[in-house]
């Protein structure tokens, strides 16, 4: 989709990712290490970024590696997305989902929340808290299990799938299944962050 600004044709992207924080409350083995200084984007910095990309997309993804729900000014960040009329997608490990419900429920421009259930954590009642939180949310929800090894589930994934089947009254679970209105499940093999130091990488790719 193209748009025009000052008689110049501008390419419009389906989505743009903005890392509002590179801080994460977990330390999962599948996430590559970074030597960057740990910090979060200030609301002023975020507004400047959004003003510069405003004409290039309608969808903002508040995630690259950090956990967006740890941001101390999450409400102000979401206020700015509302000001610029952007639809927001959030990817989270879900640990703070219940705590952040009062904030998340305020914004009708949150389009989708992806919950990475393959995260490595030992929080008590983790899945139960997420399921109860999802019942209070209105955006699209995607439960993510990106932990398959050659399409095979580990024991933790099997345990979670068993719970979800019972909660949503499903006899079987598969990638892309609709669990209920606006709630879906995504199954995929383990994600490997791209690097030229990997043993193998494709000569062709997409951006």
Language-model region placement:
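Conserved alpha-helical substructure of the radical SAM core
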Residues: 1-112, 121-125
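Radical SAM enzyme [4Fe-4S]-AdoMet core and its adjacent flexible, acidic
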Residues: 41, 61, 75, 84-87, ...
